[in-house]
């Protein structure tokens, strides 16, 4: 393989060699200085990224439970795509938290913590009940998260700001889907 890793193989600059129709994949962190800005508290930044990452991770798992269980195929596909968006958000946020805190990797944070160490909002972890309840939960969750991440687009941390800018686009779709 002419690339050092799979991630390198799927970036835009390598589209012409691998994909018939392009990947549509843009790295939201390409060219961004990952150093924590002077005057910013590393512990607070790591904790915030961890909390937002946990919210997205847990909600993505809950939404994935609807695969083969939603009332219509279109809803299954929509919820699966939203779950994948949230999983992508979780990966970036957990990676940033791990990088800033020096506490391992995104996988360490996602898989090697005890249940009580997760810092997600309770809304994200509620068990699946019925489809109507899930759509209301998604509407509340995505509206709340969209409001927070819209403000974080102006974060002094350039990495968090870039992640938020990407996530705002996705969350707008999530909210609009849930609003019907």
Language-model features: locations:
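Extreme N-terminal leader/anchor segments
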Residues: 1-41
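Conserved alpha-helical segments that form or flank metal/cofactor-binding pockets of metalloenzymes
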Residues: 3-13, 83-113, 178-179
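Basic, Lys/Arg-rich alpha-helical nucleic-acid-recognition elements, primarily the DNA-binding modules
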Residues: 5-6, 36-50, 58-71, 75-77
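Acidic/His metal-coordination segments adjacent to aromatic residues that form catalytic metal sites
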Residues: 30-50, 112-138, 155
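Amphipathic alpha-helix face/heptad-repeat signature
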Residues: 52-55, 82, 138, 167
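Amphipathic, well-ordered alpha-helical segments in soluble domains
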Residues: 55-63, 89, 93, 141-148, ...
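Helix-loop segments that flank and shape redox-cofactor active sites
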Residues: 59-81, 144-160
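Internal, conserved structured core segments that host functional sites
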Residues: 123-177
């Amino acid at each position: 393989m002419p690339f050092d890793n799979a991630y390198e193989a799927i970036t835009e600059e390598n589209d012409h060699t691998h994909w018939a129709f392009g990947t549509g994949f843009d790295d939201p962190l390409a060219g961004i200085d990952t150093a924590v800005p002077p005057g910013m508290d590393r512990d607070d930044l790591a904790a915030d990224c961890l909390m937002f990452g946990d919210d997205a991770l847990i909600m993505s798992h809950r939404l994935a439970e609807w695969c083969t269980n939603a009332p219509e195929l279109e809803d299954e596909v929509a919820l699966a795509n939203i779950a994948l968006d949230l999983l992508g958000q979780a990966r970036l946020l957990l990676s940033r938290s791990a990088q800033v805190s020096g506490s391992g990797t995104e996988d360490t944070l996602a898989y090697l913590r005890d249940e009580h160490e997760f810092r997600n909002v309770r809304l994200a972890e509620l068990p699946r009940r019925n489809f109507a309840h899930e759509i209301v939960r998604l509407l509340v969750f995505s509206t709340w998260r969209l409001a927070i991440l819209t403000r974080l687009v102006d974060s002094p941390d350039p990495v968090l700001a870039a992640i938020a800018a990407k996530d705002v686009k996705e969350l707008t779709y999530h909210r609009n889907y849930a609003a019907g």
